[in-house]
A protein has these predicted regions:
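Alpha-helical scaffolding within the catalytic cores
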Residues: 148-155, 249-260, 281, 285
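Short substrate-entry loop that stabilizes the transition state in hydrolases
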Residues: 126-178, 276-277
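A domain-start/cap signature at the N-terminus of enzymes
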Residues: 28-132, 197, 226, 284-288, ...
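Sec-dependent N-terminal signal peptides
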Residues: 1-31
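C-terminal catalytic histidine-bearing segment of alpha/beta-hydrolase fold enzymes
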Residues: 270, 276, 280-335
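Alpha/beta-hydrolase active-site loop
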Residues: 189-212
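Primarily recognizes the serine-hydrolase "nucleophile elbow" in alpha/beta-hydrolase
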Residues: 209-211, 217-263
Length: 335
């Protein structure tokens, strides 16, 4: 009996270890897209300014910088594949970006004296010399760039329609992109949180236009909830930039008369009539103001739709709307 136990215990331990090991890669893959770098890790990264989806330092051209990092080590064939899907920017050999993957580059945000990350998606067939339309994507309250870029179907549309997607953090997860004013900081947050949140978006936009060939007539805004309110605020604040905007359950507050500054920007609005966080009445009032101003818009009210309904079901309409609404040449602003 003693001999049997001595053989049985190691065998059970070996089988258990094997099962845990086999399960581990699946867990890594499931978490890596949505787990963008944490703010406490934002200074980590290599000279390319990239960090991994798990907040670890990335090596340019390695698996650590893409959305399915940690799944397995590179083989020789994978290294070759990585090289083919990596775009070099400028003369710096380390300034490389993966194509067809959600990645999280970082940059030095001088106003906030802090290094911030943002989400970036280059379409699979990206060509550095080609000009592309751009969608600036804004996440909701307590969300992240990785979360909203992982909305099912979003990157697929970017591939099929050949869009670059960029998702700023907005300084932190609750900055409101300036839509609630320049302040709003709580506790240890900066007093000018709203201003920092807004300027993070504008700095990431500037950086993206510098790094890639962006069509100035086709720069769009898309946001959900807090990101929808932020999109409307940025459209009203910088109307010379945006060709069109698309908002889902927009948490938009403030004076609706400001919408007059964005009356030449077409808007695509989606709202659930059972939303308990952003009331349908509030969104209807914004849409009524659009009608009053003669603003080009489409309004889709989802019957029995809540706040977190299947927003991605509307990407077909959103991208069709974007395609149909480039900015007029005389309305283009300089970089």
């Amino acid at each position: 009996m003693r001999r049997f136990c001595s053989l049985f215990v190691p065998a059970v331990f070996l089988v258990t270890t094997l099962l845990v090991t086999l399960a581990q890669p699946e867990r890594c893959i499931a978490q890596s897209v949505t787990n963008a770098p944490q703010q406490s890790k934002d200074k980590e990264g290599d000279s390319s300014g990239q960090v991994s989806g798990a907040g670890k330092p990335a090596v340019a051209g390695s698996k650590a910088s893409d959305a399915d990092s940690g799944a397995k080590e590179n083989t020789n064939s994978e290294v070759k594949k990585d090289a083919e899907s990596t775009v070099q920017i400028g003369d710096d050999r380390n300034a490389r970006f993966k194509t067809g993957r959600i990645i999280f580059p970082t940059y030095e945000f001088e106003m906030g004296k802090k290094r911030l990350f943002y989400g970036l998606y280059l379409p699979k067939n990206f060509v550095k010399s080609k000009t592309y339309p751009l969608v600036v994507v804004l996440h909701g309250l307590n969300g992240s760039p990785g979360q909203i870029l992982a909305y099912p179907g979003l990157t697929k549309y970017a591939d099929n329609e050949e869009y670059i997607l960029v998702a700023p953090m907005g300084y932190n997860a609750r900055g409101w992109y300036g839509s609630r004013g320049k302040g709003g900081g709580r506790g240890s947050e900066p007093r000018n949180l709203g201003e920092l949140s807004e300027q993070d978006v504008m700095e990431v936009l500037k950086l993206t236009r510098k790094n890639f060939q962006i069509d100035p007539t086709r720069i769009y805004l898309f946001g959900h909830s807090m990101g929808g309110g932020g999109s409307m605020h940025l459209a009203m604040t910088y109307p010379q930039i945006w060709a069109a905007i698309a908002v889902i359950a927009p948490a938009a507050y403030g004076n609706r008369d400001r919408l007059a500054t964005a009356k030449d920007i077409p808007a695509y609005v989606v709202q659930g009539d059972k939303d308990r966080l952003v009331s349908v009445q509030q969104t209807r009032r914004w849409v009524e103001k659009m009608k009053e101003l003669g603003m080009k818009h489409e309004y889709i009210e989802v019957k029995n739709g809540g706040h977190v309904f299947l927003a991605w079901q509307h990407f077909d309409g959103i991208f069709s709307f974007f395609k149909a609404n480039p900015k007029l040449p005389q309305q283009i602003s300089p970089k």
